[in-house]
Amino acid sequence: MSDTPSHDHGHDHNHTHEHNNPDDPLYNPHGEHPYQPDSEDTPYEHHQVMAEAVGELLIEKGVVTADELRAMIELIDSKSPAEGTRVIARAWTDPQFKARVMENVNDAAEELGIDPGTIPIRAVENTKDVHNVIVCTLCSCYPRLLIGLPPDWYKSRSYRSRVVHEPRTVLKEFGTEISEEIEVRVHDSTADLRYLVIPKRPDGTEGMNEEDLAALVTRDSMIGVTTL
């Protein structure tokens, strides 16, 4: 994981990449959604080896027990995007809550009884002028306690390297067409800071309650690769 400062990118390269090579991590013979091999099909990466080593060291030094470490892993594995969708729905319907989300996601989430963890999470809002998308260029930093485990494609080398340099092309591969008049900003998550996209509220939802609004929000829209 990275401890370098986060940075945003508002540019893209105006060219497309065809993914016709079966060795490409985003290759999909059906041409629908980016395909990423199961992690079991690929060798352990450096951060995975380090994570196991750190876990073993913490147990050996008595900082945590194996049961405590296992319980934390199970807690993280049990999380789903549902927690994040509640935050988004409340932000759409309560301007004061939205202001608190924009100031401090962690504190705002706790108001709803959600434990977002201790790592700071910053909200970035999609508007008629700006579209945001999240990546972790070095590994897979991600607000797991708020929106669940990261999808395999988020961890893929192809997504991590390409979305920074050609965001519109990558978004198009998810079926997301962003007008040239809209600025695309790419936010690089780090070990010290995570991001949450607040999707643009769909038109025609003014009369919906929070529960129904939350059902409209998807994991991918909170990452920024799709819109609602």
Protein language model features and the residues they cover:
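Terminal, compositionally biased segments used for targeting/anchoring and flexible tails
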Residues: 2-228
